[in-house]
Swiss-Prot record:
InterPro entries, sorted: HD, Homeodomain-like_sf, SIX1_SD
Post-translational modification Phosphothreonine, affected residues: T212
Stated family: Belongs to the SIX/Sine oculis homeobox family.
Lineage: superkingdom: Eukaryota
DNA-binding segment(s): 126-186
Ranges of biased composition (kind: Low complexity): 219-246
Keywords: Developmental protein, DNA-binding, Homeobox, Nucleus, Phosphoprotein
PTM annotation (Phosphoserine): residues: S221, S225, S227, S228
Subunit structure: Interacts with TLE4 and TLE5.
The protein's name in its UniProt record: Homeobox protein SIX6
Any GO molecular function: RNA polymerase II cis-regulatory region sequence-specific DNA binding
Tissue note: In the developing embryo, expressed mainly in the ventral optic stalk, optic chiasma, the neural retina and the primordial tissues that give rise to the pituitary/hypothalamus axis. Not expressed in the lens placode.
GO cellular component term of the entry, any: nucleus
Length: 246
């Protein structure tokens, strides 16, 4: 009878391999490595207490769509604060994806808020402090720096930036997509405003028998005036630097 080879790795060595594969973003190899680990009770007990191994199992479960297993791992093992950001992102993203599949459509901000209220973070990956669902200033700074260098990062760069910020590659990709949309909208509104302003001052006419001048021209047109106001209003909205994780 064929038997699987026995890997004589210590729990510390296993944890080191898991951390290396996690940092590389190679989830497929990480999954194969976890599958090859020994199943002896003594070895399993030691590995089941190792945070790096548990975090790796959670990541593999998430990427494999095995959300029940992911929730079980996160709810039944206490993780240190260093792992909280990544595991919280997995917890929320898994519930978002389940809700999207159930509803058959992408979730809006209100939908995501309701999902978070229905499935609060377990205390095993949360220290009890309220989460604003907005990225921290350091995270926003890194994202903006990378965006200025390359608004269209490839998957490898997304994984690298996710590792640096504690976000998931999906969150990084969504941030870049939203930022590009905001910049395009702001540029379009700026062009519209410049077109309105470039028409120049209106013609000044004086009504017969009246001393008050009447200004006529593009700016006096109700439609043009409305366009100008809309452009100014839209610019003030789209140029806001809001990177909330909603």
């Amino acid at each position: 009878m064929f038997q699987l080879p026995i890997l004589n790795f210590s729990p510390q060595q296993v944890a080191g391999v898991c951390e290396t594969l996690e940092e590389s973003g190679d989830v497929e190899r990480l999954g194969r490595f976890l599958w090859s680990l020994p199943v002896a009770p003594a070895a399993c007990e030691a590995l089941n207490k190792n945070e790096s191994v548990l975090r790796a199992r959670a990541i593999v479960a998430f990427h494999g769509g095995n959300y029940r297993e992911l929730y079980h791992i996160l709810e039944n093992h206490k993780f240190t604060k260093e792992s909280h950001a990544k595991l919280q992102a997995l917890w929320l993203e898994a519930h978002y994806q389940e809700a999207e599949k159930l509803r058959g459509r992408p979730l809006g901000p209100v939908d995501k808020y309701r999902v978070r209220k229905k499935f609060p973070l377990p205390r095993t990956i949360w220290d009890g402090e309220q989460k604003t669902h907005c990225f921290k200033e350091r995270t926003r700074h890194l994202l903006r720096e990378w965006y200025l260098q390359d608004p269209y990062p490839n998957p490898s760069k997304k994984r690298e930036l996710a590792q640096a910020t504690g976000l998931t590659p999906t969150q990084v990709g969504n941030w870049f997509k939203n930022r590009r949309q905001r910049d395009r909208a702001a540029a379009a509104k700026n062009r519209l405003q410049q077109q309105v302003l470039s028409q120049g001052p209106g013609r000044v006419l004086r009504s017969e028998g009246e001393g008050t001048p009447e200004v006529l021209g593009v700016a006096s047109s109700p439609a043009a005036s409305l366009s100008s106001k809309a452009a100014t209003s839209a610019i003030s909205i789209t140029s806001s630097d809001s990177e909330c994780d909603i």
